[in-house]
Amino acid sequence: VILTLVMGISSCVSDRRRNVVVDASQPDIDVQLLDVNAYSRPGMETETITGIVIHYTANPGSTAQENRDYFNSLQYSHATEASSNFIVGLDGEIIQCVPTWEVAYASNERNTDTVSIECCHPDDSGKFTDETYRSLVRLTAWLCVKFGLTEEDVIRHYDVTGKNCPKYFVEHEDAWDEFRQNVGQAIERSMEE
């Protein structure tokens, strides 16, 4: 076992695929807010945040930047209403599209009291890359600490609507349970520091 020292608050958590070192402080976030518009960033304030909703893009191989730009383009195409507060890319990069105090069009009736995270994935399985997974654990743990939540408040889009999203975590319940455990361990570790 190789231990990695990370500056800031860190926790070593693992899942069946890899060892994950999580820094529970704020991750690096590339803030690229969408233009305020009726189709992807309505500019409405959220209520008290009571949960974090995990999604997958359902667009294999697409990048965080491509997904962010798609959301922003909806103001011109009027194709649908869709967005997310954050997008985690294939290399673990994080783009913020909508402030956490504003509604994102991602989780139906839970849009007003949750923060949504879209995740890129390389193929049709919906399984995230190691880099995406690590960043997702870190971002989710940081948001939980920020809003006074626990891993029990982290849900899938599936848990709101029954949609097969995020696909891999819906089809592999054990991987979902392990992800939430990883988030819980990171939160716990951050509280000890």
Question: What is each model feature region?
Answer:
Residues 1-8:
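Bacterial N-terminal signal peptides
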Residues 12-107:
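N-terminal catalytic cores of peptidoglycan-degrading enzymes
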Residues 12-31, 123-193:
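Basic/polar, cationic surfaces and motifs that engage anionic cell-wall
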Residues 44-46, 78-79, 105-109, 124-135, ...:
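Extracytoplasmic/periplasmic, Sec-exported soluble proteins
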Residues 53, 87, 116-118, 155:
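Soluble periplasmic/extracytoplasmic beta-strand elements of cell-envelope proteins
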Residues 57-58, 110, 115-124:
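Cell-envelope and extracellular/periplasmic
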Residues 71-77, 105-107, 114-117, 134-138, ...:
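Short, low-complexity, polar/charged sequence segments that are solvent-exposed and flexible
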